[in-house]
Every structure is written in C-alpha cells, then in structure tokens.
Regions:
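Conserved C-terminal portion of the radical SAM core fold
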Residues: 83-85, 240, 245-257, 281-283, ...
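N-terminal [4Fe-4S]-dependent radical SAM core
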Residues: 2-23, 160-163, 167-207
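Radical SAM [4Fe-4S] cluster-binding motif and immediate context
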Residues: 21, 187-350, 361
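Glycine- and acidic-residue-enriched helix-capping/strand-helix junction motifs
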Residues: 32-45
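Radical SAM enzyme core and accessory elements
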Residues: 1-28, 34, 54-61, 76-80, ...
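Proline-centered flexible-loop/turn and helix-kink motifs
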Residues: 54, 108-109, 133, 312, ...
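Hydrophobic positions in alpha-helices of CheY-like receiver
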Residues: 49, 102-103, 107, 274, ...
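Glycine-rich beta-alpha loop elements in corrinoid/cobalamin-binding modules
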Residues: 58-175
C-alpha cells in the first residue's frame, strides 16, 4: 500500500446517473457492557452537511460505524463506499487507520478523510502522508464547514486545494477561522441523525456541548490554543431541547464537552434546567459528567449543589495538575491559592458533595520532592478519598508536543498501550497507544519510578482507604506527614517481600518498570473479580481484599518499623483500636452482617471530622461501635468490584457509611507516649 497513487478528480462520485454516492462515518468507541457513546463529533458534521441540498441530493450517509470490531469484518460489510470519514482521538486512532487502510486497498477510488484532535496540525504534519498514504485529506481544527465543502467539491470539481482548513496530499490550505455562530450547525440529536442507532441493542451515552473554546493555554492540553481561546455559545433553547431529548431517549450518562462549565453566568440556569428535566422525566439522564472551570468558585459551587441535590453529578473535579509553582509556570497554568483550594474542598465536603482532586505525574518542571510535597498539601487540605493521579501523555496538538518545548525540557516519552480501564481484556482487535512522559529535565526516569510508586501507595492505601484511618491517626497524633507514612510503607514492603504488602509492591514495581522501559501495558487483570482491566491501585486493592486478614495481621510489623524510623512509641491499646476500626470499616465482599465491638476512643467521629476538614482532638473513653453492611454481596466478587470500585470509587464507597458510635460510661485514659530521646 505504500505506493498508492490516485490522481485528482479520479475519486468516483457516482456509478449510475442520478444515484447517490455512499458515505460512511466512522467514530469508534469502546463498549462497556452494553453501553457506548453516540458519535457526536462526526454526527454534527453530517447534520450540517446534509442541510446543503447539493450534498443531500448526491451523497447518502449509509451508516455511522462506532463498534470496535475486526477491521476486515467492518470493511466487508460496507457497500461500495465512495467517501469514508473518520473522527479520531487517542482512543481510536489505531482502529481508524487500520480500517482506512483496508478500505483503500479494496476501494482505491474511495475518498478517505481524517479529522479530530488526533490529526496533527498543519505545521506538525511532517511525513504524515508518507506514513499514511491511504489517507487523502486531513481536516484541521473545527470540521463542520470544511467537511461540507469537501463533500461539495467531491460532487463537483474535486478542487480540494481551494478549501481552507485542510491538507491534501501534502498541500496545506490556509487556516479556517473558527465559527462564531455555532447555531448554524444543527443538533444531530434533534434532527434525527442518530435514529438508526437506536435500533441496535445498546444503551447510549451522549456528549453535550454548551459552548466551544478554552481561555487557557496549558501546555499538556490540546483544548485551548492561540486560535481557540475565545468562547462561543450554543443557544440555550437548543440546549434545553437536547437535554429533553436525552431524557426522552433514556440516555443514562451525559458527558459535557465544555472545557470550562461554570465560567459563564448562564451556566447556573442551565444546571437548574438539567435538574428540572431529570426530576420531571423519571430520572433521566441519570448522571451528568462536568468539566468545571477552575477559578469561578462560587458559581461552580452553585452548579454543583444544584446537580448534587438531584443526584445528577458524580462530583466536582478539582484539576490542580500540580501544586508546584515552578511546574505551573512551565506548563502555563495557574491554580487557586492553596488556602482557597483547601476551603473549597471543605465547603463541598460539608455539603455532602464529592470532590475529586486530579494530579498529573510527569509534568516538566516537577521533581520528586515537589510531587511529594504536592501530594502532602492536598491530603492536608482533606482530599483524603478523592485523589486521582494520572500519567502525563503527550497529545499530537498540545503545546507540549512542540519540538522546541520538548527539547528545552528534555521530555522523553515511551509509546505504551493505552491505559484503558474496565474493559474486557483481549476482546479489542486493535491496540491503541499513548505517548507517556517518563523523563524530563527535572525528573530522571529513576525518580519517575519513585513518583509512580508513591502515587500507587497513596491511591491504594489512602484514597481507596486500606490504611487511611491509620495514616490520619499517625498524622494527627504523632505529626507524621502522610507522604512520610507512605514512603515508610514502601520501604517496609521492599524489605519484607514475602508479606502480602511486599508481594503487591514487587508486582507493582515490575509492572511500572516494564511499562516505562519496554512499553508494556499498564492495565491489570484480577481473575477473581470480573473479567475486565483495572488500574494499578484498583488491582492491588482487589488482590489485598482476597487476603485481608493476613494483610492486617502484618501491620504490627509495619508500625514497629515506623516507630523506629520516626522515633515514636505507639501505645499498643490505642493502635490496636485503630487497626480494629480500620479493618472493620472497609466494605467487604463476604456475607453482609452487622459488626459490633468496643474500643477505647472515639475513632469514628474523629475520622469523620477529619474527612470534612475538621481537626478535632481524639476523645478517650469506652465506645461501642456498630457497623451495618447494607450491600449483602454474599461473596459475589463480580458485583462487589463493579459496585464498590468501578461505579463506587468516585463516591467513596470503599468504606461503610452506616457506622454508629455510642459512648460507654467507663473511662479510658491511655495516652500516646512520645519515644524517649
């Protein structure tokens, strides 16, 4: 296929007079059970194009192709394709090019068009057309008008070089200005574009735009740029009708495609209408996933409160990315001040609104120390069960992929299989890849591994909760930093490889090393819990749950090590009480039952206060604890892992919520004693 040569004007636009040329629109997505996204990106392109009579009279969209299947099988079902249009991103690039390659082999005169964020900008194309000779046209930036003009030229003279916003066989045309009036583009939802898909046996999710553009220019992101920093709006009347459509079609999950929802005053009103539609429709859509703006704190709080009261939002994401000033300067990002962020988190927790704090590991400018200090600051700000740490990957059109930027910051990447969680392993016919940052001028690969291990420990044992109560205990009563606690845990694990913890540590460390040195996959499989892929921390959590008794039996050894390294003596009765409570509060997959026991201090209220940012002194005395298990998993590991980890992680469901603490009259005066100097 490397020698494909097709002369201009030789794309067949018809075989029979007065017949229509067949167009196929591809936007591949992952199937989660029976759930999949409607192809909004390419759907809105066709919704606009078909309003032009000359296109509608001469071109027929035969089908939207969205399922990831064997590429040969996909192409074998096509009927004389004359145009194949692909909407691409990091999760479907390899699938798209595999299908496009076969289409061109079997139908050499088919016009193949690629667009979407994964298509390199014109100034970054390089040898793109040599590498992908089966692609005829690439669309850069916003695609609706460019796509329609391509179809018009296909019908007529095929003078594609005259169309702004594309590259054609190495020739790049002038940049197309962004469309200011987005309402000229019909909604693919409201115009019936997706009607054919509802005949298929799937539950659909939807992407929803209320505006386009991002005023920020973070170097790791391809959302904002010099040409996309102004925000343009869709009309509110259209938006309300689309939300009513989602309710009518029983769309369970809506993902908002806005970069900064909450940045505009009108967004509060839009949120109110979403909540009202959900209330009046019997609960649809069930959830709305929002990318909130990072600076409009009061407005965002209003919106989150509205959605939370209707049980619509999965929680608010605080995308800090880094807490280090130098790193933020390097990636051209500004954050809320720490005091404001801390108050923000506590405000949401007080109102019962879940927060998720996101950090990116591997950003240029970050060091091991700054990464560690950032994690410490976030945990001190009470982001205890909400910390999500993502690996930095380089996107084709992000400023971080600029050659000068990569050279300046000595960015080294590794191509590794895309880290996609909660999908059935081995079922996907084509592997997708990420360009993962593993080294920068300020962080060598060995320090990157240390950061990965600290991230793993913090997320497994703190965010997911296996040792969170104990870490809070040592922090508040001994002054031991959270990150020190987890660094010591990693040391202990390495020194004790035959323990449950040690084995899990070695397994994780090997996985990290294989991924960053050999480009192996990051995903994990735990056969006892669902046939699906899990992140590092989720897999460790599940494996430890299989050996929970042994894991907690080993904690005396770890606390002896911690006592020696940090110079504290832990009063054994208090430590035993915290261990008992920590083990009991974790949701388990065994038969549901009520657990009751007595302890010598008010651990439950102490822990609950800490989770919402209230630092109160631990009260001593005798307390009766009653923990009720409402789940009754009865050993059903599949249901357990789905409800508690897959669905429930964002809601902090790894801990039982029905915990009653009742004081008993007898006093308990044991105190924590500092180690002798």
């Amino acid at each position: 296929m490397d020698n494909i040569e097709i002369e201009q004007a030789e794309f067949e636009n018809t075989d029979v007079p007065n017949s229509k040329s067949n167009l196929y629109c591809f936007q591949f997505s992952y199937l989660y059970g029976d759930e999949i996204y409607l192809p909004y990106s390419i759907g809105i392109l066709w919704a606009y194009a078909r309003t032009i009579p000359e296109i509608n009279n001469n071109i027929k969209n035969k089908s939207f192709v969205i399922l990831r299947e064997n590429p040969n099988d996909i192409v074998s079902r096509l009927e004389e394709p004359k145009i194949a249009a692909f909407s691409t991103y990091v999760w479907n690039w390899e699938m798209s090019v595999s299908v496009a390659r076969i289409i061109k082999e079997r139908y050499p005169k088919c016009l193949v068009i690629f667009g979407g964020p994964q298509v390199p900008n014109a100034d970054r194309l390089g040898d793109f057309f040599e590498k992908y000779p089966f692609i005829d046209i690439t669309v850069h930036g916003e695609g609706e008008i460019t796509f329609s003009e391509i179809l018009l030229e296909y019908v007529n003279d095929q003078k594609f070089q005259a169309i702004p916003g594309l590259s054609y066989r190495g020739f790049t045309t002038e940049l197309r200005p962004r469309t200011r009036d987005l309402n000229i583009f019909p909604s693919p939802y409201l115009t019936g574009v997706f009607d054919e898909l509802f005949a298929l046996p799937y539950q659909y999710h939807a992407v929803w735009e209320t505006n386009r553009g991002c005023p920020y220019g973070c170097t790791f992101c391809d959302w904002g740029s010099l040409i996309a920093q102004k925000i343009f709006l869709f009309d509110e009347e259209r938006l309300i009708k689309e939300m009513e459509y989602f309710a009518h079609k029983k769309i369970a999950h809506v993902y908002m495609g806005d970069a900064n929802f909450g940045i505009l005053d009108r967004d509060v009103g839009i949120a109110s209408r979403i909540a009202l539609i959900n209330k009046n429709s019997g609960g649809f859509p069930k959830k709305v996933r929002v990318n909130y703006t990072k600076n409009s704190t009061d407005r965002v709080f209003q919106i989150a409160n509205i959605l939370n009261k209707q049980n619509l939002d999965k929680g608010i994401t605080l995308s800090v990315q880094s807490m280090d000033p130098e790193t933020l300067l390097t990636i051209k990002r500004s954050n809320l001040k720490y005091e404001t962020l801390s108050a923000f988190i506590k405000r949401y927790q007080k109102e019962g609104i879940d927060t998720y704090t996101e950090v990116i590991l591997g950003l240029p400018g970050e060091t091991y120390k700054s990464f560690r200090d950032g994690i410490e600051a976030l945990l001190e700000a009470s982001a205890h069960d909400s910390l999500w740490i993502y690996r930095c990957s380089v996107l084709p059109n992000a400023p971080m992929n600029d050659l000068d930027y990569k050279t300046k910051h000595k960015i080294k990447t590794v191509k590794s299989p895309a880290d996609l969680h909660h999908i059935e392993p081995g079922k996907d016919p084509i592997q997708e890849y990420d360009e993962m940052v593993v080294e920068t001028a300020t962080m060598q690969t060995k320090d990157y591994v240390r950061c990965q291990l600290l991230a793993w420990a913090t997320q497994t044992f703190h965010a997911l909760g296996l040792l969170r109560v104990l870490a809070i205990f040592t922090n508040q009563l001994n002054g031991i930093q959270y990150t020190t606690f987890y660094e010591r845990l990693l040391e202990y694990a390495e020194q004790n490889p035959n323990t449950v913890l040690g084995k899990e540590y070695l397994k994780t460390k090997e996985k990290i090393n294989q991924a960053i040195t050999k480009g192996k996959s990051w995903f994990n499989i735990v056969p006892e819990f669902n046939n699906q892929t899990w992140s590092l921390e989720e897999a460790s959590y599940l494996r430890i749950m299989l050996q929970l008794q042994a894991f907690f039996a080993e904690q005396d050894g770890f606390f002896n090590y911690l006592s020696k390294t940090e110079g504290f003596v832990f009063e054994q009765k208090i430590l035993a009480d915290f261990l008992k409570y920590q083990k009991a509060i974790i949701v388990k997959y065994e038969n549901g039952k009520t657990e009751e026991f007595q302890i010598g201090c008010a651990i439950n209220s102490f822990h609950r206060n800490m989770m919402i940012g209230k630092k109160k002194k631990l009260q001593y005395g005798n307390y009766h604890i009653t923990i009720t298990d409402p789940y009754n998993f009865n050993g059903d590991k599949n249901r357990y892992s789905t409800e508690i980890l897959f669905w429930g992680r964002r809601g902090g469901k790894t801990f039982y919520q029905m915990c009653k603490e009742t004081p008993i009259e007898q006093e308990h005066t044991d105190q924590l004693k500092p180690a002798p100097k």
